[in-house]
From Swiss-Prot:
This is Serine hydroxymethyltransferase. The modification N6-(pyridoxal phosphate)lysine is found at K226. Its EC number is 2.1.2.1. Pfam families: SHMT. Its cofactor is pyridoxal 5'-phosphate. The keyword Cytoplasm applies. Belongs to the SHMT family. It is found in: Cytoplasm. It catalyses: (6R)-5,10-methylene-5,6,7,8-tetrahydrofolate + glycine + H2O = (6S)-5,6,7,8-tetrahydrofolate + L-serine. PROSITE patterns: SHMT. It comes from Staphylococcus saprophyticus subsp. saprophyticus (strain ATCC 15305 / DSM 20229 / NCIMB 8711 / NCTC 7292 / S-41). GO terms for cellular component: cytosol.
Length: 412
């Protein structure tokens, strides 16, 4: 940081302020995590200087002999992590990974079956404001109104009715185990290909704590951050038969030069994920999420679907304490707990207001938070959301947050 401090004091101040925010707050955004110093070091290395259009040993530029090695390491480690036949580590984001699969599997206007956004899906799974919903004819499946879990009978019914060319499984706000085998059976029954977006659960999948979609899906996409705890980026895993189509769709189809410094950071993160302690970490992520859900339930909050199987907890704050997700997010942010407002199934509020909040445990677990810490986190959340205008409660909540964060510094 010394070079930035000398050369650009404004950006230096931004970075320092952001570090302090991360260190002094409890991060509960389910899609965020804290990378290791090794991952950050790789991403900030001289590899950022290198242009490398193409793929290892098939580049359009000279001088790629070393980035070829790092990209190959990333590919091989990802294959080992997930048991994939082919991996492309070049997508700059999960959204671009999804776009590439759509371009391979579909023609403009084709019918696709994806999860309703307000039920836990993702923008790139057919939202009208997203390219996916504008280029393709998406039809939706959702969760059962009673148990708030995916209704596979409904998925089959909608699939039979609309005959999609592609079925998309995966979610951005779904706290239960997804039955990829069942999705594959449904896809086969209607003659569709299956794509799984495992961005949120990739870390759990890598260590065997969630069923692996690679066995069942034609295409699997993911981000490399979130539970996988790598740099921000994307990745595609697919059957060997789709290798050439996927690779040429990423380059030269929708991207040019790959970000080789980010790919090296992906390789480092995948190497970390192959170590035994990564499974211990993921086990703690799940235990912490269960503790968070159970304690909030004990405190009188309604947890969507009644609990969690993964890293994520969705909470109906409007139905529980009569405030919107927007108010809940702002109230928690004021005391140093960061989360995001989120629609819940059958939500009547607008997406920028919402009836719920989405909470996740990966980032705080990386800091060393255990079940005891998350029980305290849940009680702090309860304290302030039950009376969000109570200054005394807010002050107490902030003090208790500071006690937790001081015990678990972000980076030593």
């Amino acid at each position: 940081m010394s070079f930035i401090q000398k050369q650009d004091k404004e950006i230096y101040e931004v970075i320092q302020n952001e570090f302090n925010r991360q260190n002094n707050n409890i991060e509960l955004i389910a899609s965020e995590n804290f990378v290791s110093e090794a991952v950050m070091e790789a991403q900030g290395s001289v590899l950022t200087n290198k242009y490398a259009e193409g793929y290892p040993n098939r580049r359009y530029y000279g001088g790629c002999e070393y980035v070829d090695v790092s990209e190959t390491l990333a590919i091989d480690r990802a294959k080992k992590l997930f048991g994939a036949e082919h991996v492309n580590v070049q997508p700059h984001s999960g959204s671009q990974a999804n776009m590439a699969v759509y371009l391979v599997a579909l023609e403009h206007g084709d019918t696709v079956l994806g999860m309703n956004l307000s039920h836990g899906g993702h923008l790139t799974h057919g939202a009208p404001v997203n390219f996916s919903g504008q280029f393709y004819n998406f039809v939706e499946y959702g969760v059962d109104q009673e148990n708030e879990q995916i209704d596979y009978d409904e998925v089959l019914k909608v699939a039979k009715e609309h005959k999609p060319k592609l079925i998309v499984a995966g979610a951005s706000a779904y706290s239960r185990t997804i039955d990829f085998k069942r999705f594959k059976e449904i896809a086969d029954e209607v003659g569709a290909k299956l794509m799984v977006d495992m961005a949120h659960i990739a870390g759990l999948v890598a260590v065997g704590l969630h069923p692996n979609p690679v066995e069942y899906a034609d295409f699997v996409t993911t981000t490399t951050h979130k539970t996988l705890r790598g740099p921000r980026g994307g990745m595609i895993l697919c059957k060997e038969e789709y290798k050439k189509q996927i690779d040429k769709t990423i380059f030269p189809g929708i991207q040019s030069g790959p970000l080789e410094h980010v790919i090296a950071a992906k390789a480092v993160a995948f190497g970390e994920a192959l170590q035994d302690d990564f499974k211990v970490y993921q086990q703690q992520v799940i235990q912490n999420a269960k503790t968070l859900a159970n304690t909030l339930t004990d405190e009188g909050f309604r947890v969507v679907s009644g609990g969690t199987d993964n890293h994520l907890v969705a909470v109906d704050v409007k139905g529980s304490v009569g405030i919107t997700g927007k108010v809940a997010e702002e109230t928690l942010d004021a005391i140093g707990i960061t989360c995001n407002k989120n629609t819940i199934p059958f939500d009547q509020e607008k997406p920028f207001v919402t009836s719920g909040i989405r909470l996740g445990t990966p980032a705080a677990t990386t800091r060393g938070f255990d079940e005891t810490a998350f029980e305290e986190v849940a009680k702090i959340i309860s304290l302030v959301l039950k009376d969000p205008e109570n200054e005394k409660a807010l002050a107490e909540g902030k003090e208790r947050v500071n006690t937790l964060t001081s015990k678990h510094p972000l980076y030593n």
